[in-house]
Amino acid sequence: MSYFDYGYFKYSNKNIKKFDPKKERTKLSDKRGIINRIKANEFDKEFYDGDRINGYGGFKYDGRWKVFLKKIIHKYKLNKNSKVLDIGCKKGFFLKDLQDMIPGISIYGLEDHKYPIKNSMKEIKSHIEFIESFTSINFKKKHFDFVHAHNSIYIYNLRDIIKIIKKIEHISKRSHITIPAYITDTERLKFLKWTLTGTTILNEDEWKKMFKYIGYKGDYYFSGAKSFGL
């Protein structure tokens, strides 16, 4: 188990300055209320492609995963014979870029909301499966060479997150989880003010203790207030 930052948030913060600077995110944090959180937690059009105050404000493909998939491919030694699962794949952007970079690789996506699947990329849609809950994931032991879960499981409660991480450990040879965390109370409050869908937010030491306790041996990255530029 190791901490691995493949650069997603560094790239995102650098390339979205022109339309979503830190001060704009702070303004959104100040404006977001319970109705915005209700709309966001439907994980429907309003969250993905509606107003920015309710979610992404337009979840569109931009090819950004190709920038840091190079690191992922190298670290996890992925090739055309590999099987890769993306948990919480949304519209399939990670899978699309991975397929483009390694033609012939076996890609699988699981998504627990129907809107992003319906609006996923046509060349990827057949590779995405709807699942009511990631706690129901059911594959054979070490079925996948690599399992990826990018900020997709923290919307669950702690008990379910433990179930999901145990399943990730069971079905993967190697894995990487990105999950929100904080160090200081100030970071925690900033993130809670910003997030629309966050349910389980622990500090970094708590996540590490939990990983060790449940036997998770995969890699991880902690996102949070600093990652989002708050």
Question: Which residues does each predicted region cover?
Answer:
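Short catalytic micro-motifs in class I SAM-dependent methyltransferases
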Residues: 151-155
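Class I (Rossmann-like) S-adenosyl-L-methionine-dependent methyltransferase catalytic domain
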Residues: 1-76, 85-139, 156-167, 174-230
